[in-house]
Amino acid sequence: MSKATCIMVQGTMSGAGKSLLCAALCRIFAQDGWRVAPFKSQNMALNSFVTRDGLEMGRAQVVQAQAAGVEPDVRMNPILLKPSSDIGSQVIVNGEVRGQMPAAEYFRRKKQLIPDILAAYNSLAEDFDIIVIEGAGSPAEINLKSEDIVNMGLAKLVDAPVLLVGDIDRGGVFAQLFGTVELLEPDERARIKGLIINKFRGDVGILRPGLAMLEEKTHLPVFGVVPYLKADIEDEDSLSDRLQVKNAVKPLDAAIVRLPHISNFTDFMPLEQHPLLGVRYVQTTRELGTPDCVILPGTKNTVDDLLWLRQCGLEAAISKLAQRGTPVLGVCGGYQMLGQTLADPEGAESGRPQTLRGLGLLPTQTTFAAEKRRTQSQATVTAAPFAGAHLTGYEIHTGRTTVQGAPFCTLADGTPEGSVQGQVFGTYLHGLFDSGELTEQFAAYLCRRKGIDPAAAAPISMQEYRTQQLDLLADGVRHNLDLAAVYAAMGLAQPAERGNDQ
């Protein structure tokens, strides 16, 4: 079997649009008939996913795999860093936790992971035709280049041609692109085959003099000017923008607590798409107000975030709302917080042995341990008023929770999962709203409580919605990128049947 060819997308900065451009290329190449896989050697993210094999990887490569029409595979993201504090991260290699590591220590040791990176990449390259590689941040971070394993360092290891993308929406795109190229070594510059300007609004004709000058100064062609596309696809940067939403503009008000170490808040994207649900993220009691429901999301540090919740007054405010009958939902770390006690006898979660009281809204006790549970799950909700809703999700957590009372749902093997007491619900299952059934019943339940006709609460299938948005993204990129030049950079001919509509 011949080895795959590849193309790498690097950016002038974080947020330039690398992840979504890679997703678009995965979609385009798959539409053109190629077997495509994404790859990012090292990803730093709070939002992760569990594969069918029970291994953990970054969600950006999950989205890119979905764009390519293939199942997410941990080989697509061999190193995942999950920040657990301001100076340290949990290091996950090939889907398994290697441990907590301060940033300085990881920087010194990360080149030791090159064999893992190459093994994952080479294995993928045996199974696919094209590998779409995503860089991280900027290749011109000259203080980090000596230990680089994700930008030009990786490009050299796998002999990848590079597309360099700059974000015009934030201004200074010509300086971004020119400055980045100038800071690279000659052999690194030689890897760049073309420049891309991303997130453009307006008449591209205004840019043409600047494009010509940029090409003259960098001796590199501009492969395209991609407009600011409205495709609603999760990536780390757009997700961060979602956390800024403070006001509900729909009939139902769902307040999600923005914990300091919030993670996997992709769980709530289906709620955001619902026509009646206004989702907002809150950090203070004033912002919390009197919503129609409160959601405590997952967190990378349950103990620290519980203490923060207590100190800022949100614990007391949420407890008062619950006493008045306001529905409260906790997911993963949020579920743990809702219980009676959280014990950390080995310091696995907090770094020192301790036991904390929870919010006391659910009859549960959680004990933390070093071993992490990672699994995909199917379940049927048993908790009224959502009984009968089927959902597919996944678990990523270190705590083990014992429940006195009714479960939230029953797993496919008959195991009870989660907890419910009155209008307070808790579950470990991430992705619980993706299938649409629980979203529908959740919205209808809130509608009935507020006297709104639930007929408008139509089910939302995230799979269908995501497919539509990926097609929208791919079409926008296909029409504005010189795909013939991209194919030529990979040493391939562009398939004639699709062509390029630029």
Where do the PLM segments sit?
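Conserved P-loop NTPase catalytic core
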Residues: A348-T375
